[in-house]
Every structure is written in C-alpha cells, then in structure tokens.
Amino acid sequence: MKIKRILNHNAIVVKDQNEEKILLGAGIAFNKKKNDIVDPSKIEKTFIRKDTPDYKQFEEILETLPEDHIQISEQIISHAEKELNIKINERIHVAFSDHLSFAIERLSNGMVIKNPLLNEIKVLYPKEFQIGLWARALIKDKLGIHIPDDEIGNIAMHIHTARNNAGDMTQTLDITTMIRDIIEIIEIQLSINIVEDTISYERLVTHLRFAIQHIKAGESIYELDAEMIDIIKEKFKDAFLCALSIGTFVKKEYGFEFPEKELCYIAMHIQRFYQRSVAR
C-alpha cells in the first residue's frame, strides 16, 4: 500500500486494491511522504474511506486536533469495544474525538464542566461509566489532567450512544433528561427529597428507562386488569396523582404518552419514596 495523503504523524490515507482507506497507528507517517510504502506493522486501525460527510469530518479532525488527544480518544474507544465485547458504531470516532479534545481544552483552562444528568447516567449506563473511570486514569497518566465525574458522565453517554448504533446522542439525551424531569416532578409535587444513592432510586430510574424504550418501540410490557388499576388509584392516591402530572408533562414536553397501566406502575415506585418520607 502506498501513502496517498498524510493526515498527521499517526494517520494516513492510502489506496489499496481500488479502495481508499484511512490507517491509524503510532508513528505510521513518521519520516514518510506521499507515495511511500506503508509499514504493515504500524497499522493499528483501518477504515474504508467513504465519500460521506462523516469521513470528511473524520479526516478534518485527524488533521486539526492535537495528536495526543486523538490517540487517547482511540485508546478509550478500543478499551470500550474490548470491555463491552462489541464493535462500536464508527461515527464515534468523529463525535467522541471532537468532544473529548474540547473537554480537555476547557479543563486545561480551568473551566468547570457540569453534567445535570450525572446521577441518572451512573444508574442507567454503569458499564459505560466504568469505561469513563478508566479513561480518567488514562488521561491523568498521559496529560496530567484530572477528569471530573461530570465529564465521565459525558464520556459514558458517547459510548452508550455508539454502542447502540445511534446516529447521534439525541435519543439517549431525551430519555435521560426525561427521567431527570420526572424525578424533579416527584420531588416538587410531593415535597420530598429523593436520595440518589439508594436501591429505590436505582429501581425507579431503571424502570423508567425500560418503560420509555419499550413504549417508544410500540411494545406492551405490563398487564394490569381494571380492578388492580382502581385499587392503585385508591390506595396510592397522592402517588397516582403525581404520576398523572408526570404523564401530562411528558406528553406536552416530549410528545410521548404513558398508558394508564404504566402510570400505575410509576405510582407504585413513587409510593415507596412517599412512604419513607412521611415515616421520617
């Protein structure tokens, strides 16, 4: 394979059997120039180059971002694929590299990164969050920069989105933000404080994610007969009224509708928090 274009010391474009490829590898372009032969032992990652905006953006990132940021980003992606035992959506190489480099730049300049969805992310995406913790140690070792938990949450979101082959983070953010909004409604309407580091909190967040994903997919997940629905409405009156408020809010803000039986299950989760708050 001959080098067609050098993007940086660790990235080149080659032509191989009528296909253009982007090759990544530490020092793959060191002391090389156009038309030189590629050293196969230097190749760490190969991408078939396609004439799409994603690949044009990828090349632009490889040419413009700091090379150590790109190397760290690729190490994190490789670690994620190994830990999750999957092949991650290739779009992550653009979005994540760009995000991580900007985050490192902000932290280097003493700026504070805040993530209002951090607690939900820890519960919803625990494996991805562990990968973020691994990334923190790597970045500290390579750059001497400490990555706060808030940014680890952002890393986890990128990994989760790419893991599920989503085109962007919109759906992941929508679900996580919706859950954060629901929890705030419960706290405000019932005048209670939901402690995040508890089993009940984890159950509620996990249940909401599961329900939202299945309802969005048009799948029925629970069966409750009319008698049981009436019992829940009567026995857990305040909790059910809170669930109704949640349903109204979510429909208005997200265009998403919880069926009545799902609101009953949400009411049962709410009741746990409400009972504990009243008992104190």
From Swiss-Prot:
<dbReference type="InterPro" id="IPR001550">
    <property type="entry name" value="Transcrpt_antitermin_CS"/>
</dbReference>
<comment type="similarity">
    <text>Belongs to the transcriptional antiterminator BglG family.</text>
</comment>
<dbReference type="InterPro" id="IPR004341">
    <property type="entry name" value="CAT_RNA-bd_dom"/>
</dbReference>
<keyword id="KW-0677">Repeat</keyword>
<feature type="domain" description="PRD 2">
    <location>
        <begin position="170"/>
        <end position="280"/>
    </location>
</feature>
<dbReference type="GO" id="GO:0045893">
    <property type="term" value="P:positive regulation of DNA-templated transcription"/>
</dbReference>
<feature type="modified residue" description="Phosphohistidine; by HPr">
    <location>
        <position position="207"/>
    </location>
</feature>
<feature type="region of interest" description="RNA-binding">
    <location>
        <begin position="1"/>
        <end position="55"/>
    </location>
</feature>
<keyword id="KW-0804">Transcription</keyword>
<keyword id="KW-0694">RNA-binding</keyword>
<keyword id="KW-0597">Phosphoprotein</keyword>
<keyword id="KW-0010">Activator</keyword>
<dbReference type="Pfam" id="PF03123">
    <property type="entry name" value="CAT_RBD"/>
</dbReference>
<dbReference type="InterPro" id="IPR050661">
    <property type="entry name" value="BglG_antiterminators"/>
</dbReference>
<feature type="modified residue" description="Phosphohistidine; by HPr">
    <location>
        <position position="99"/>
    </location>
</feature>
<comment type="function">
    <text>In the presence of sucrose, SacY is activated and prevents premature termination of transcription by binding to a RNA-antiterminator (RAT) sequence (partially overlapping with the terminator sequence) located upstream of the sacB gene. Formation of the SacY-RAT complex prevents alternative formation of the terminator, allowing transcription of the sacB gene. In the absence of sucrose, inhibition of SacY activity by SacX leads to termination of transcription.</text>
</comment>
<dbReference type="Pfam" id="PF00874">
    <property type="entry name" value="PRD"/>
</dbReference>
<protein>
    <recommendedName>
        <fullName>Levansucrase and sucrase synthesis operon antiterminator</fullName>
    </recommendedName>
</protein>
<dbReference type="InterPro" id="IPR036650">
    <property type="entry name" value="CAT_RNA-bd_dom_sf"/>
</dbReference>
<feature type="modified residue" description="Phosphohistidine; by HPr">
    <location>
        <position position="269"/>
    </location>
</feature>
<dbReference type="InterPro" id="IPR036634">
    <property type="entry name" value="PRD_sf"/>
</dbReference>
<dbReference type="InterPro" id="IPR011608">
    <property type="entry name" value="PRD"/>
</dbReference>
<keyword id="KW-0805">Transcription regulation</keyword>
<dbReference type="GO" id="GO:0003723">
    <property type="term" value="F:RNA binding"/>
</dbReference>
<feature type="domain" description="PRD 1">
    <location>
        <begin position="64"/>
        <end position="169"/>
    </location>
</feature>
